[in-house]
């Protein structure tokens, strides 16, 4: 059970970090 929770948390963090990096990249491109 603990492994599943850690896996879900890992996936959630990966999605959040990816979304933030993509969003920041788009803002940087638009700013130029």
From Swiss-Prot:
GO cellular component entries: chloroplast thylakoid membrane; cytochrome b6f complex
Stored Pfam families: PetM
Domain of life of the organism encoding this protein: Eukaryota
GO molecular function: electron transfer activity
GO biological process, any: photosynthesis
UniProt KW keywords: Chloroplast, Electron transport, Membrane, Photosynthesis, Plastid, Thylakoid, Transmembrane, Transmembrane helix, Transport
InterPro entries in alphabetical order: PetM_cyt_b6/f_cplx_su7 (IPR012595)
Membrane-crossing residue ranges in chain numbering: 5-25
Entry membrane topology: Single-pass membrane protein
Family named by the database record: Belongs to the PetM family.
Its job: Component of the cytochrome b6-f complex, which mediates electron transfer between photosystem II (PSII) and photosystem I (PSI), cyclic electron flow around PSI, and state transitions.
HAMAP family: Cytb6_f_PetM
Subunit structure: The 4 large subunits of the cytochrome b6-f complex are cytochrome b6, subunit IV (17 kDa polypeptide, PetD), cytochrome f and the Rieske protein, while the 4 small subunits are PetG, PetL, PetM and PetN. The complex functions as a dimer.
Name of the protein this chain belongs to: Cytochrome b6-f complex subunit 7
Organism of origin: Emiliania huxleyi
Gene giving rise to this polypeptide: petM
